[in-house]
Amino acid sequence: MIRAHESPHSPHMPEGGIRTLVLVEGPSDAAAVRALATRLGLEMGLDTTLHHIQISSAGGITNFSQVLAGFARAHPSARLCGLYDTAVGGERHVRRALTAAATRIAAHQSPESAGFFACVADLEDELIRALGAQAVERVLEEQGELPSFRRFQAMPEHRGSPVHRQLHRFLGTRATRKIRCAKLLVERLDLAKLPRPFAGLANHLVKASGVG
């Protein structure tokens, strides 16, 4: 089973049942990783565990230390992995969080060596670049959101910006849209051409689950 959108300290977590924690910054990231896991063939569910993987949103990079430390105390033998944004000192926060969880990495090593993969801007940016603007617009059209996007593009503050940037800003204007579209964009990815951080995490999850 893969669980999403729960705290690592959730009272509903089966004792000793989680072997891998995937920690991300926000709920849209969790939705994207959950969609990736489904595409990788990892069994999903709410009440039973198969692959013993939990996907959790920390509610921001500054909460990584608290979440990882608490999870490591409750599950000392579990694996830790995740995604983070490079903005706002992302790598520094991840290194501090790994230290709090007693997972030390050498100064010359990147967080990737501990299973944490960096998105250059954020995950939505990575997904838009991987799919291309036309594919993302098709997703918006299927959701009935394309007219809203066209109006957004016509606003003076957005007019003339690259379409990629317009799409990124539009997805972020509503939290529900951002979460919904994150899942839909992942469902359209070519698994052989995943964005670099997603490819690294996918490889980590497959190894952790024993699938493949």
Regions found by a protein language model. Give the residues of each.
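Charged phosphate-binding loop/patch that engages nucleotide di/tri-phosphates or the phosphate backbone
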Residues: 164-212
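Exposed alpha-helical structural elements
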Residues: 32, 63, 122, 126, ...
